[in-house]
Structures are given as C-alpha cells and as structure tokens.
Amino acid sequence: MYLTIIFLFISSIIFPLLFFLGKHLSNFRYPNLPPGKIGFPLIGETLSFLSAGRQGHPEKFVTDRVRHFSSGIFKTHLFGSPFAVVTGASGNKFLFTNENKLVISWWPDSVNKIFPSSTQTSSKEEAIKTRMLLMPSMKPEALRRYVGVMDEIAQKHFETEWANQDQLIVFPLTKKFTFSIACRLFLSMDDLERVRKLEEPFTTVMTGVFSIPIDLPGTRFNRAIKASRLLSKEVSTIIRQRKEELKAGKVSVEQDILSHMLMNIGETKDEDLADKIIALLIGGHDTTSIVCTFVVNYLAEFPHIYQRVLEEQKEILNNKDVNEKLTWEDIEKMRYSWNVACEVMRIVPPLAGTFREAIDHFSFKGFYIPKGWKLYWSATATHKNPEYFPEPEKFEPSRFEGSGPKPYTYVPFGGGSRICPGREYARLEILIFMHNLVKRFKWEKVFPKENKLVADPAPIPAKGLPIRIFPQS
C-alpha cells in the first residue's frame, strides 16, 4: 500500500512533466527550422530573454545569437511558445510587408489574463478595433488642436515639479508629465489628485505584462491583475458619467478621445471600453516618458547639442508674444530638436521589439517557419547594427538630416500597416517637453559616468536619472 502511494505520487509528477516535454519537443520537429536553442520545457529561454533587459542590454539576447548562428534568423522558446527571431532590415521588411498575409500581431497570454474581455474576441481582434477607433484622433489635422493644451500642461508641470529644485530624479517626473497629458486628452481629467491615484496602478500593470504568468500572491503578474481590475473599475465610472453627459448635451464629441470613441464604437460594455482606454493610456504615456528621460540624459552629456537645441527653441520664442502658446507651425520648425529625439530613440528604443504570430507556413532566408509559431523582431538590435549606423554607440543627431536612415533600419514606431498610430502624438509631446525644458533650465547629471539602464520591460535609467538643475539665465 505504501509503495502504491509513492508510485502514484511520483507518477503524478513525472507523467505531466513528460507530457509537457513531449509537447515542447514536438514544436521543433519540423524540417529545416532556423538554428537555435529551445531551452527548458515550459520556460524555454524566457529567463535569459528577460534577464538581458534587466541587466541593461536588451539587444544582447538577439545579437549574441545572431553572431553565433550567422543566419539573420534563429529559433528559441519564449513565454511558453516556439519563436523565430528575425533581425536586420530584411527581417523588419519581411514582417512589416506581410502583416495580415503571413503574420498578425501577437501578445503573450498574460495580456489576455490581465485584460480579460467579456466578448469572445481575442486581444488581437480587440487591438484592431481599438486601432481603428483611435486613428481619426491621431491624424495631424486632429492633433493641431491639442498643441496649446499640451503646452499649457507642460508649463504647469515645470513650474510645479521642477522650478525651485536644486536636485531631482527625472524619470518619475517625465512619467507624471506624460501621464497628465494622456489623462487630459483622452479623458478630460485634470484633477491632479485623481491623476495621481491612477498613475501607480498603470505602472504596476505595465511591469506585469511581460512577467512570468504565475498568478500567486505577491508575484508581479498577480499585482498586475489586481491593478487592472482597479483601473477598469475607475475608468468604467468615468465612461458611464461621460455617456450621461453626451446624452444630455453637456459635453462635445470633440472634447476628448473618449467622447469620440463613445460616439463611434456602437454597443460595447463599459468594462470592455475601459480596457481599450487603459491600453491607450499605457501606450500614450509610457514610451514617451522614456524618450523624454533619455533626452534629458543626452543633452546633459553633450553641451554643444544642448546649445543647438536651445538656439532653435529661442528662435521660436523670439517670434512669439509673452505667454503665447505653441502652435503646430512652431512644432514644424523644431527640426534639429526632432533629430536629437530621433537619435535618442535609435540608441534607446522605448520598445525593444514586438511580437507576431505566423498564420500560415512560410520560409524566410531558406528556413521553414511553421504556422502557429511566434516571431519577434528587435528594434534595438537593428538600431545598433554598424552596417546601418556607423559607430552605433556614438550619439550623432546628424544621422537624421537629409533623407535620413535607409528604409527598415530605423523602426522605433514599428512599420507597415502596424506602424504606431500615435507617432505624431508622441512627436508633439516630446518636442513640447524639450521646448519648455531648455527655455527654463540647464542641468547636469549627479552621476556623470552612470549610464546603466534597466529594461523591465521598457528601458529606464537604473537610478532614475538624478540631476542638478539650474534656472536658465
């Protein structure tokens, strides 16, 4: 009897392990697959992939394997799925031009669990719907009316958060700035206390999306699920209130992005629309806060570049009345400032890369990619390829003068039909931040030689970028 119990106990452990091992290996029994390693059952090479980012070199996972296999493509196993990782301009072009033909957007299962939908549609289908709803609000003709509002928020931000400070940490403040703008433009929310209440759970959700999806108390994933529920409840309340205001004619459809979506989305549960808004708020502030942070970093490191940015912004100021807000025409004159921001995004892409799923069998560079496999493309590895950018570690905004980089070599916003719909929104936000920053302040890094970053999942300075700040004379 005792031996039988032991046998059953051991069998209950071994047989599931053998099943998962067999399933794990069966994914890689196709002919002529790309070279590469599959790692351990279930987790594959996920820990190595995440560890590279947390150690400050998110491109290292890709570049080390590209160098080892010399194929421009390799296989691995990430987030519970078999993966092909494609690299370089040719890989980017292949994925971007075959969107919805051979590949579609894909996110780890953790996304569906953090943002559960009450509908039968997948996160991919929901993302397409959200994208279609957002597009009209992100066109230049729609964004023009936001410039003055963004400028006003920026002025208040620097007055309340930066002025009269001797020393501060940049990253938390850029997140506060971009989140305030997102809340104002998406939800007409300008109550600072309410904005602060939402900011922390947004950060918790973002860090949990690419964590190991183990829903146990205390894990990142578990905290992200709880934070998502809290956000959904709060945003659903805002949605119900806005519906009543629109019905009563108290607000305009043009007031903000939420009002526009409500008038065009049709029958949708408040909770599902709340998830769409939450996703937009994450996308609308998280990546741009990273760019703004590293703009501060590189302008501190290169005083001659700071000076050129300052001169460009002074020229714009000299043609405006005191207290006159920025306009779209002013933004269009910030060419050198935008070159600086572009070089920041080349060296530190706010998204290291994204995922796709093969919806059919196909070949790339002579290797077979099975239907159902996932794919990953790396912006960081492409941007630091000396074939495309000589001396890739050198900060050189002139790379973006004239015709700029060759197609598919510079991809901070992705490309093809899936190119980021908010790229013009991001450009406005970054340039308005730069304008208000340099016109008011000079600064220096507290730790001049400290350049370590941590990608978890997005890249941030390891210490948040402490600076000493001085009023502009």
Curated annotation (Swiss-Prot):
PROSITE patterns: CYTOCHROME_P450. Pfam families: p450 (PF00067). Its cofactor is heme. It is found in: Membrane. It is a single-pass membrane protein. Heme binds at residue 420. It comes from the Eukaryota. Signal peptide: none annotated. One of its GO terms (cellular component) is membrane. Its EC number is 1.14.-.-. GO terms for molecular function: heme binding; iron ion binding; monooxygenase activity; oxidoreductase activity, acting on paired donors, with incorporation or reduction of molecular oxygen, NAD(P)H as one donor, and incorporation of one atom of oxygen. The chain crosses the membrane at residues 1-21. Possesses triterpene oxidizing activity. Catalyzes the C28 hydroxylation of alpha-amyrin, beta-amyrin, and lupeol, producing uvaol, erythrodiol, and betulin, respectively. Catalyzes the C28 carboxylation of alpha- and beta-amyrin. Possesses 22alpha-hydroxylation activity against alpha- and beta-amaryn. Belongs to the cytochrome P450 family. This is Cytochrome P450 716A2. It comes from Arabidopsis thaliana. The gene is CYP716A2.
